[in-house]
């Protein structure tokens, strides 16, 4: 994918249609190569396969994980090293095993959400992570001092992956399979790294859930006005690689 906006649309579209998708991005000579991994029974929609040149390869789970082992080396975000467990690490690092779930820390939307969480007073707070994927945001919040953290995802594979990652980091987090539209209760902080249309559809759910702070990410910059029109002007917005994340503060 040579056009940056096309790349963003492709990734957002794939993530929306296949929420348990694992992926890696490689950049070479101005071209982004997106490797995405789908379950064996998943069928790629024709509108995607016709728009971009796509090569399909068959992997069993072990081949896929072996392939990731050679490609995912980790990243440094908001002062925290995010690493796979096979890399040399220390207690302060956040460990993520790249399973079939979104969130290794390499994508800008995840990084922007982490940046916003890093500036919040999380010590002793409760946090709900909606669409938790690999659990990366929830685990980060727990390691930063949140007293109670809950992560929810509609996809059971993602929840399994998140539970595995919580064990890797020796943190106690409640991960549950749940429909975001049915969420109730109140949490000091709510994070949601989703796609724009889903965030817009969940506005009436997300806002009452957040007692103090609401973090929204997964938003291409071109959707800035859509989010502001629905949620209002943010307390803070951060940008990176043509993506944007919003922080709302309840007063």
Where are these predicted regions, by residue range?
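Active-site regions of enzymes building and remodeling cell-envelope glycoconjugates
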Residues: 50-59, 92-96, 230-238
């Amino acid at each position: 994918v040579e056009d940056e906006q096309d790349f963003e649309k492709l990734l957002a579209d794939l993530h929306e249609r296949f929420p348990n998708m694992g992926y890696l991005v490689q950049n070479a000579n101005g071209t982004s190569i997106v490797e995405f991994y789908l379950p064996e029974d998943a069928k790629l929609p024709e509108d995607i396969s016709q728009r971009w040149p796509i090569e399909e390869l068959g992997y069993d789970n072990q081949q896929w994980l072996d392939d990731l082992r050679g490609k995912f080396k980790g990243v440094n975000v908001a002062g925290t090293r995010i690493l796979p467990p096979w890399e040399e690490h220390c207690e302060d690092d956040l460990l993520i095993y790249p399973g079939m779930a979104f969130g290794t820390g390499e994508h800008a939307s995840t990084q922007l959400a982490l940046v916003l969480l890093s500036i919040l007073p999380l010590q002793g707070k409760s946090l709900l992570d909606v669409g938790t994927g690999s659990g990366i945001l929830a685990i980060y919040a727990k390691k930063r001092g949140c007293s109670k953290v809950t992560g929810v995802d509609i996809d059971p594979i993602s929840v399994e992956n998140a539970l595995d990652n919580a064990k890797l980091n020796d943190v106690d987090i409640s991960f549950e399979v749940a429909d975001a539209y049915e969420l109730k209760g109140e949490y000091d902080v709510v994070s949601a790294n989703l796609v724009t249309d889903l965030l817009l559809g969940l506005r009436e759910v997300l806002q009452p859930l957040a007692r103090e702070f609401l973090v929204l990410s997964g938003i291409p910059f071109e959707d800035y006005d859509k989010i502001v029109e629905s949620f209002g002007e943010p307390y803070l917005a951060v940008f990176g690689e043509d993506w944007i994340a919003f922080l709302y503060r309840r007063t």
